[in-house]
């Protein structure tokens, strides 16, 4: 929200660093007004008068101590005291990040927080360019803490008496104005803090600079930085020497606004395009099938292998370890059970989710390839891809429950209407996609256990469900009735045109929904990091990062389908259909090629190759591109190489690991974690035993349940089963 778009005056505080005497009266007043406990402090020689070291859940305002060079001062140095607190951006990144409007900007300036709406995702902590929000890690239900610009003081009722004497109307208003002033400003004895409208504070700042050019640098920090803030600074030394980050004028939420604003029309466009592709390819394939009398019928049956094997017992032990870790996370609390901190609010579990979602993309890729593009030669691996996708996304949801600080507030995702929140889009999109995966897989148990009526109902009504689900998604994301109606028309028309006319009808609407929703959430996982150009290295950050995430997921998901099919053949001693896998490898080749060309082309257009290969991050980037991209691209480049099982395995493994490494770099390795304002103390991060336990347990559960489902239901083709001896 720009100043021009504001509905009225913006309440603003001007901080004059040149006048601050470091008394910390503001710091004490802030604690008193917000009823925050004191915290144990330590004398640290490099911090001087600064105590505590950083902002925290109990310290919203902090006076930071700086020693700056000044040849004219005794000893060649002078002290500068800087008030650190929330800057209350005019276009706050934390508000753009919040998926539930727990963080929201008031029309007159303050960025406020409502704990009752917070789900504890901590995305705001990473998104804030000033590193202000903190979590109460000592609590079993860690909430976000930050300065609210004393917005609650304005809500205080008008006083009607003072010291037992009734007040006149003018006196009451004067006292009310005094109360409404932020506690820190009221406590300042040195004319270092002023409070008023933004226009008044800018005028006063310019007056002071003009009156004393020898005392101030000609820069009002916060006037234009990232679109402007409601807290402005004056200083006698350059702000960079005081640790202030150097930012341009463009607010970071502008990046996500562009990306997420394209989602509603993209949903309609992708759905319509997929419907057109299906109509074209179905007609062409039908003609070929009628001429050859080959309609590609494939039979499935349960795997005839014993469940009690050493391998499965190991999986059960790991699952028990994961279950114990999951319970421990809630008994101990998020802070005590993990090594997460204000420096690293996201850790192994978020990394785990981003990697898992990327490599599980094979489910939507195979659905689109088999049904939309009518590749019936790949129909035999469709069920395994969908089952693995269903299990993977289900356990991603479990991981998110463990990672959320307040998971019992998740219902707020259905009640709030945040503006341009990538987290909100991902949450709804993934949730709806899980239901699509479930509907795609349900015909398998229905066929196994003879639920013919349920199967008929699913076949008849899945199109209507898809139209309703996608329309709901578009409305929730845009809050635009026109977009919602247009989406209903597009997907309703597709559902009617492709409605089931017999028992052999294809679930094309589910396939269209799978591809559409996956396109949106795979790309929006990249949108999560559009708010962090100040943290993510330029080799990975890009305004088109969402497209890069989507393209790379296709390559990784397709490659994982190959690895799973090879694992099935090896683990259960099944025949390996190299012809079929070579065809999947060809899809992986083109997906990987498009991804690499797009990503490297984007870097070239933005001029990011200069220095891209230098330093440790340069080596990481080179390894990701070379080993995870170019090498598998070469190995998948020809049919002869793809039909060699060993080379196909290596190429697929490298492609999966390359995309996984890309997500690791984006989440952790290529990020600059500075800690909380004023960036003097940054903790290290090593995942705890509980974090590892939950992650390992869920991986084991995925593998075990996949094997269990294959034994109980017709997941594998009849050609893949037989009387071969059990391997494991």
Model-assigned labels for residue ranges:
Residues 344-408, 425-432, 436:
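Membrane helical hairpin/interfacial module
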Residues 292-324, 377, 415, 419, ...:
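Long, contiguous internal "core" modules enriched in hydrophobic/ aromatic residues
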Residues 270-284, 325, 367-368, 440-441, ...:
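Alpha-helical transmembrane segments
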Residues 1-292:
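Non-ligating segments of multi-cofactor redox enzymes
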Residues 32-41, 283-294, 327-343, 372-375:
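Membrane-interface helix-loop junction between the first two transmembrane segments
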Residues 291-362, 366, 703, 707, ...:
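N-terminal signal-anchor module of multipass membrane proteins
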Residues 469, 639, 643-728:
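TerminUS-proximal long segments
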Residues 258-262, 331, 424, 542-552, ...:
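Membrane-interface transmembrane-helix boundary segments in multi-pass integral membrane proteins
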């Amino acid at each position: 929200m720009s100043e021009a778009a504001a509905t009225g005056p913006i309440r603003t505080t001007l901080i004059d660093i040149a006048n601050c005497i470091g008394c910390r009266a503001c710091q004490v007043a802030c604690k008193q007004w917000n009823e925050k406990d004191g915290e144990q402090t330590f004398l640290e020689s490099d911090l001087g008068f600064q105590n505590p070291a950083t902002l925290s859940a109990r310290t919203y305002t902090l006076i930071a101590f700086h020693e700056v060079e000044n040849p004219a001062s005794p000893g060649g140095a002078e002290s500068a005291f800087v008030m650190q607190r929330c800057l209350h951006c005019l276009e706050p990144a934390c508000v753009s990040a919040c998926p539930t409007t727990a963080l929201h900007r008031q029309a007159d300036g303050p960025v406020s927080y409502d704990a009752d709406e917070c789900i504890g995702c901590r995305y705001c902590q990473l998104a804030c360019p000033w590193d202000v929000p903190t979590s109460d890690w000592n609590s079993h239900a860690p909430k976000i803490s930050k300065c609210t610009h004393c917005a609650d003081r304005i809500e205080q009722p008008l006083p009607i008496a003072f010291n037992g004497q009734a007040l006149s109307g003018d006196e009451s208003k004067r006292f009310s104005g005094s109360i409404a002033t932020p506690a820190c400003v009221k406590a300042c004895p040195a004319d270092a803090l002023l409070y008023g409208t933004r226009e008044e504070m800018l005028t006063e700042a310019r007056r002071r600079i003009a009156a004393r050019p020898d005392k101030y640098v000609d820069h009002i920090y916060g006037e234009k930085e990232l679109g402007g803030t409601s807290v402005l600074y004056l200083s006698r030394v350059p702000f960079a020497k005081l640790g202030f980050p150097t930012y341009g004028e463009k607010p970071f939420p502008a990046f996500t606004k562009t990306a997420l604003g394209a989602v509603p029309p993209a949903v309609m466009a992708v759905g319509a395009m997929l419907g057109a592709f299906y109509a074209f390819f179905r007609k062409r394939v039908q003609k070929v099938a009628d001429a050859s009398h080959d309609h590609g019928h494939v039979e499935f049956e349960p795997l005839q292998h014993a469940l009690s094997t050493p391998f499965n017992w190991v999986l059960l032990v790991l699952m028990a370890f994961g279950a114990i870790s999951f319970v421990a996370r809630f008994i101990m609390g998020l802070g005590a059970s993990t090594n997460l901190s204000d420096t690293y609010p996201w850790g192994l579990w978020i990394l785990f989710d981003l990697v898992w979602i990327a490599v599980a993309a094979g489910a939507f890729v195979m659905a689109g390839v088999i049904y939309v593009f009518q590749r019936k030669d790949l129909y035999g691996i469709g069920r395994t891809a969908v089952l693995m996708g269903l299990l993977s996304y289900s356990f991603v949801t479990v991981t998110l429950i463990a990672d959320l600080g307040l998971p019992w507030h998740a219902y707020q995702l259905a009640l709030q209407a945040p503006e341009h929140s990538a987290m909100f889009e991902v949450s709804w999109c993934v949730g709806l996609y899980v239901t699509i995966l479930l509907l795609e897989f349900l015909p398998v148990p229905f066929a196994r256990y003879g639920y013919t009526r349920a199967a008929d109902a699913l076949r008849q009504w899945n199109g209507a469900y898809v139209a309703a689900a996608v329309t709901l998604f578009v409305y929730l994301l845009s809050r635009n009735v026109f977009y919602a109606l247009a989406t209903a028309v597009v997907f309703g028309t597709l559902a009617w045109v492709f409605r089931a006319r017999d028992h052999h009808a294809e679930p094309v609407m589910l396939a269209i929904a799978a591809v559409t929703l996956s396109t949106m959430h795979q790309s929006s996982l990249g949108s999560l990091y559009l708010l962090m150009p100040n943290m993510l290295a330029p080799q990975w950050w890009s305004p088109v990062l969402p497209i890069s995430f989507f393209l790379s997921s296709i390559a990784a998901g397709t490659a994982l389908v190959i690895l799973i099919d090879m694992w099935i053949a090896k683990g259960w001693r099944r025949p390996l259909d190299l012809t079929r896998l070579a065809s999947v490898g060809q899809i992986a080749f083109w997906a990987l090629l498009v991804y690499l060309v797009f990503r490297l082309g984007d870097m070239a257009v933005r001029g990011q190759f200069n220095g891209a290969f230098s330093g440790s991050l340069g080596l990481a980037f080179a390894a990701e591109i070379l080993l995870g991209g170019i090498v598998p691209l070469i190995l998948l480049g020809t049919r002869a190489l793809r039909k060699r099982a060993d080379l196909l395995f290596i190429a697929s493994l490298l492609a999966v690991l390359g995309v996984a490494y890309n997500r690791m770099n984006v989440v952790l390795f290529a990020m600059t974690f500075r800690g909380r304002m004023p960036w003097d103390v940054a903790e290290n991060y090593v995942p705890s035993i509980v974090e590892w336990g939950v992650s390992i347990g869920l991986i084991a559960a995925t593998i075990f349940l996949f094997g269990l489902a294959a034994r109980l239901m017709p997941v594998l083709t009849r050609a893949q089963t037989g009387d071969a001896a059990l391997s494991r």
